[in-house]
């Protein structure tokens, strides 16, 4: 993950709630590739390191650079990854980092939408990937046949929020930010996320020089088990950039009030108020691309 405010994430809670959503996505992305076990990989926005564990197991003879800018996430990742000697944990923005070697794979799960400048990110990634002729003559570094085909080249394996992501949730959040109680706190509000379109992303990749790209959106509406888990997920992940603006002497009370209003809106907009479904309307942007 990549974040605006260093040390601003509740990494311990994120470590718990992300098992229900982000961890599942990360496992799916790992299956896009036929792994050989000796790849040099960057986990761009590793968060608490949960999916980095699985990535490290994929490359026992390789190396994983687990990169995140948030100090709390880095601390949690160190705790989660202490048993792996093929993982190096680095606190940095993944668009500014300088690594000592070129990469076979750049993996990123639920992080790229925190970066506003995707052109810069993809250009940085391009510069970090090995060109084909220096790729150690691997016979096959492609992805599974239902993705981008088998191509002997370095590659991106990325999933993040895409165009339309959380639109229903954002609509409810904006009702609260525009309310009399909270309008003043959000007068200079700018959305922290950039949810890109698939066509725009594919065009950008090709302009930089990537080949054999496969870029597509898919909807993934997630239903969380109950009010308590949903509330923790919203507070820790979805509403985080909104809650950060409520930093005053009464910050905790304001955040509690904001969350209560949001949950009230969810209940009010439920089609069956006697049996509320705690839904998250995700849209995922899936990206596989190769550096020739």
Over which residues does each language-model region extend?
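C-terminal helical/coil "lid" or tail adjacent to the Rossmann-like core of SAM-dependent
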Residues: 214-276
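Core SAM-dependent methyltransferase catalytic element
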Residues: 284-292
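Conserved catalytic/acceptor-binding region of the Class I
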Residues: 119, 130, 134-142, 148-227
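N-terminal, positively charged/glycine-rich alpha-helical extensions of SAM-dependent methyltransferases
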Residues: 1-12
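A short acidic, Gly/Pro-enriched loop at the edge of an enzyme's catalytic core
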Residues: 95-105
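Class I SAM-dependent methyltransferase SAM/SAH-binding core
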Residues: 40-44, 48-97, 120
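A short SAM/SAH-binding and catalytic strip from SAM-dependent methyltransferases
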Residues: 104-118, 160
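Conserved alpha-helix/loop element of class I SAM-dependent methyltransferases that forms part
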Residues: 20-39, 54
């Amino acid at each position: 993950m990549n974040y605006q405010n260093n040390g601003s994430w509740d990494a311990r809670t994120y470590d718990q709630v992300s098992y229900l959503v982000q961890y599942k996505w990360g496992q799916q992305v790992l299956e896009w590739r036929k792994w050989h076990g000796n790849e040099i990989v960057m986990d761009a926005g590793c968060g608490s390191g949960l999916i980095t564990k699985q990535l490290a197991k994929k490359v026992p003879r390789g190396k994983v650079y687990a990169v995140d800018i948030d100090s709390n996430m880095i601390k949690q990742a160190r705790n989660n990854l202490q048993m792996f000697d093929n993982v190096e944990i680095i606190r940095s923005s993944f668009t500014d980092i300088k690594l000592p070697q070129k990469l076979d794979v750049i993996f990123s799960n639920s992080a790229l939408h925190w970066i506003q400048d995707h052109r810069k990110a993809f250009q940085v990634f391009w510069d970090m990937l090995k060109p084909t002729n220096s790729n150690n003559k691997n016979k096959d570094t492609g992805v599974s046949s239902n993705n981008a085909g088998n191509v002997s080249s370095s590659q991106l394996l990325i999933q993040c929020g895409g165009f339309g992501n959380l639109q229903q949730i954002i609509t409810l959040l904006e009702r609260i930010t525009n309310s009399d109680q909270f309008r003043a706190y959000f007068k200079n509000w700018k959305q922290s996320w950039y949810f890109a379109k698939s066509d725009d992303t594919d065009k950008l990749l090709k302009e930089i020089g990537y080949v054999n790209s496969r870029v597509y959106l898919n909807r993934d509406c997630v239903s969380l088990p109950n009010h308590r888990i949903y509330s923790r997920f919203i507070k820790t992940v979805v509403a985080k950039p909104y809650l950060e603006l409520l930093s005053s002497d009464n910050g905790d009370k304001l955040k509690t009030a904001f969350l209560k209003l949001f949950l009230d809106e969810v209940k009010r907009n439920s089609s069956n108020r006697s049996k509320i479904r705690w839904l998250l309307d995700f849209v995922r942007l899936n990206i596989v691309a190769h550096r020739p």
